[in-house]
Curated annotation (Swiss-Prot):
Residues 35-48 have a biased composition (Basic and acidic residues). May be involved in a process influencing telomere capping. The modification Phosphoserine is found at residue 23. This is Restriction of telomere capping protein 4. The keyword Oxidoreductase does not apply. It holds the Pfam family RTC4. Its main location: cytoplasm. GO terms for cellular component: cytoplasm; nucleus. The keyword Chaperone does not apply. It is found in: Cytoplasm; Nucleus. It comes from Saccharomyces cerevisiae (strain YJM789) (Baker's yeast). Belongs to the RTC4 family. Residues 35-59 are annotated as: Disordered.
Amino acid sequence: MVGPGLGINQVRRKGVYSTKKGSGDNLLLMKRQGKHDIHDRESDDLSGHDAFSPSKKRGKIDSITEDEIEVKKLSTVATFDKLSRSFPNSEVQAAKNAALRGKEKEEEKVVSIPLIQNLKNEDIESIKCRNNNLLDGKKLLLEAELSAVEDNQIFSSSFPEDKKLSLQSCLSSKEQIIKKLQVREEYMSKFKLPPMLFSDELLTEVEPFMPIVMDILEGKISSAYYFEAKNAFKNSQKAYLSVDEFRKLNLNKFTAGFYGLKRQLRVGEEIAKRYKRALTHNQPATLKWWGITDFCNYVLAPETLTSFCIYQLNLSNKSCSSKTPNKHPKQQLNEKEYYYDPELRMLAYDLLEDTVEYGIIVADSDPIEQWEAAIEEDRLRELKLDVHNYSSRRWRLDTHD
């Protein structure tokens, strides 16, 4: 039964968008019930009479509403006519204006009723950032590293205490540069690592190995990094990789060892550009959770560098496998089975895992652009350190010779 002064539409609105305490929990249910009740009444009316077509029903409702408005207007006019007999014209006009202002305020309150939302404001802002590509891998990595410095938990306990990573190595103090040389000499003698390439050189060298990206996406090859990424996704209760969860990740499992994170991220950027279309369409659940940028940086880039590692270090000599091609990778793109050989890839995975410390302390502080080499040498002169002995140039020249 519609109360006096209320239209049918107003009653429905109050029933569905009630803001009384406790109504938020039942909001969706009330909406569904309201829709079903209205639909049932309309279907019953439409089944028997053509006179109650949707257009005619709307006309009838509109006419009822118009009649009610006219009645309200007439009653208002009659009321003020009575008042005009007992008060001066100025007071009557003031009363009319006050009544109109009160009515406008009531209408504004009805229109501006806020709907209850299920998402918290911070969640909505995070989703907006993700949709606008504001939470890219570099920003997440930076925040995670800063947090880790505060907590003194950069890497897991896989390293001894005296070899725990310190991000302050990037500050290039004299002690840190001396320590860097010690780490470099230790790992170079133990693993015979190749020289660090500049970014343009690296991208040129790894280009022939990038087709592994499509093979991973199509499930043609198993991936150790994809396996770790999938586990992180399964253990999460979030719809996407959040900053907090990124901070909790063990980055050892997503780092391409001696290549370092800086060069790994450059490869990831190139992969994201080249395979943007394939990465956007038909995304697996793991890729959706990580996001394209982070998936390229921490899954596809290290897998590409794993293939490059097999080529650079000629790991077939350390394997019992009889496959020992000595061709340049551009000449053996049709020999994927060589670089996809499980035995060779396991050797590469082990090597990269064992050289994570080298990658962070040495590779990430080495110049990644050619013009940075001059800055490095200027810094060594400022600290009164021997340029030939401590500069990265020495290791590039010695290794090539």
